[in-house]
Amino acid sequence: MINFDGNIVQFGFGAVGKSFYEKVSKEIHFNENKYFVITANKNEFAPYINLGGLACNFIESEITKDNFKEVFEKYLNSGDLLIDFADTVGTKDILSWCAEKNIMYINTGEADWPENWYSIFNENLLKNELKEKYCNSSSVNKYPIVLQHGNNPGLVSHFVKAGIAYIASTQYKKDKHLKELIKHNKFNEAAYKLGIKMIHVNDIDLQKVNDNYNNDTLFNTWCIDSFFFEMLSESTINIGTHENINFKDDCKFIDYANGFLELKRIALDQKCNTYYPNGGFDGFLVLHEETITIAKSLEVKEGENVIYRPS
């Protein structure tokens, strides 16, 4: 178990936040008097108390672009930890503040303030600029910052590595070079050697509906704001180096250098064929950050030239 003596602020207490709170004490040994939960929803107080939280450490506050620094600095100092489960908040702004204040920060996914309908491609480039800025400084960003490490992009990125390792160990048992690549975490070179061209990340909800189901009704089990944003944004793909784009008229823009492709159609109007363990299904092509981060992590370069990247 990890011992942590500093303050911990959990920002957000929805379904995922509650699940995390229930389990965090099994992973981290901390002082319960130093664990704070910040949420805008006063109705979360009862489940927070039922899960063993201290009443005085429950902070009901609507976090905005104008007040987030003022609220967070009451509970966080250098070396403390901010765990972000919130939506419609400015990831980039919070990241910058944490880096400047030397506060550890981890969040589950990309977000921005409600007034900004953002591009995941542009946000990715801006995050890379911030990474370069803070990585070269000796006075700030002294503690780890991990972005987008929820189920996806986070967990599915580990699944990709596990999948590559599984293919190598089951279909190429005698390939010693592949074993060495996996052993030394060179998954990009392993994917290149295996000739992996496309990776699908799929969500399929198999929960039963206790109601008369018909195709005119949407039963949503995901965060409403995120679902709204993702379904009404243009579909995106990160294109591999092998791709020959013969549907350019359907594209809003293509950036071959980074592999960014945005279609003119929104996700609600764009379906594609995909698979899950029980077979094929038609899914909506929804934008999500792992299309960028997984493809980027598996790039192989010769000098400055990208010679391999899967879609």
Question: Which residues does each predicted region cover?
Answer:
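Rossmann-fold cofactor-recognition segment
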Residues: 52-65
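NAD(P)-binding Rossmann-fold cofactor-contacting core
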Residues: 29-49
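C-terminal catalytic/substrate-binding lobe primarily of soluble NAD(P)-dependent oxidoreductases
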Residues: 166-311
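Short amphipathic alpha-helix with an adjacent loop that forms part of the alpha/beta core around
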Residues: 66-77
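N-terminal glycine-rich "phosphate-gripper" loop used for MgATP/nucleotide binding
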Residues: 81-91, 95-97
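Adenosine-phosphate binding glycine-rich loop
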Residues: 126-194
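Hydrophobic/small residue at the entry helix of a nucleotide-binding pocket
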Residues: 16
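Rossmann-fold NAD(P)-binding glycine/threonine-rich loop
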Residues: 92-100, 108-143
